[in-house]
């Protein structure tokens, strides 16, 4: 018997599709169903690597964990990773197949993409009871509908009852909903079986007259109003980083993350956001660095271009001065490559071929090449006493070699190519995404920062962040489902 299907689309980007899809996955799984998420095509710089070494959007990995299953490539057969100048890296069935310009994508990849989507759906339909699908952006972009692989084309193919979610916090929610429905084809509009309003602040009763009008005007029931929630889940794209973030008051430590223009895999920071004693700031490169307890240079899709931005804005010099004064810097993936002496791009993969000077803070030379490394890793910590294996994953388009005198530098892990630290414990670099999810390792690293402030150490015998994420998903599902009624729409599936 084929799986039942449910679709979630949004009036805009950032409306809450990923959150709602994750909650529905969790809710159905709690009832004993075998559930899988699905997003035909995703455009995001937050990615995850499956056990088989395939790359998918991190949001689909999060939804898989919500469903209680291991992420796999079939959940997101197409991933587009923007890399500037109107180009994107195309990842099909988990593997890089090329780079395309927006104007050429439809011609070069539409048919191949739709085939990958239908094959993935056929596979999932045979193995699961439910497929919870997520759209992308808006389903009513009339100039793009002929090339839309993600929204109503998938819903129509599956005959899936569809939920339309809208963000009320940005204003204009009724116009967004009615306008979206008006722009859909009649057959597509007939699939919309429910409306969800997300991010509501204030007194619920003040919405009642508007909701009544909405149902009478559209003929579509409102399934619920989700209140504004502090972020319990990983954001899908860097748009989230532009939202004002309240600084945690009374925190012992301040950690500054450089908000690179093409920042990628900033989900690496989520475990720090969950630490009560840590305040995290995402800082644009043109702003003064100040004197935080630590700086993180995160991953980036275009290392060389973002390195140039650091130079042009003066952030490169600020980081060098900060390091010379004993400040702590952790570079992750592309951020680690920047900390080295040089980055070579002989094939011009990121623009003009050449060799570019790094920040010169670590004995590391990186050469970009055509082969992309995407694999999960399990290793042992050498620098900190962590009895449990260190888990993470690599996503990088380049190989790094240690150069010059390595006196005073120590490998972080049993696999020495995965990370390096100086003797003073102030300059850190790693290729491991997800490193800070390893609870004992994260606490040891934070305790090093705390000792410089003469603060007592935190307990290190704590579980992996994945356990904390599971609790958060349960709490999120309980909170959201208290404001939704999905039983009616599920009966239509």
UniProtKB/Swiss-Prot annotation:
Molecular function per GO: ABC-type vitamin B12 transporter activity; catalytic activity
Catalytic residues of the enzyme: 333, 433
Positions of the GATase cobBQ-type domain: 252-441
GO BP terms, alphabetized: cobalamin biosynthetic process
InterPro entries in alphabetical order: Class_I_gatase-like, CobQ/CobB/MinD/ParA_Nub-bd_dom, CobQ_GATase1, CobQ_N, CobQ_synth, GATase_3, P-loop_NTPase
Pathway: Cofactor biosynthesis; adenosylcobalamin biosynthesis
PROSITE patterns, alphabetized: GATASE_COBBQ (PS51274)
UniProt keyword list: Cobalamin biosynthesis, Glutamine amidotransferase
Protein task: Catalyzes amidations at positions B, D, E, and G on adenosylcobyrinic A,C-diamide. NH(2) groups are provided by glutamine, and one molecule of ATP is hydrogenolyzed for each amidation.
HAMAP family: CobQ
Similarity annotation: Belongs to the CobB/CobQ family. CobQ subfamily.
Protein name: Cobyric acid synthase
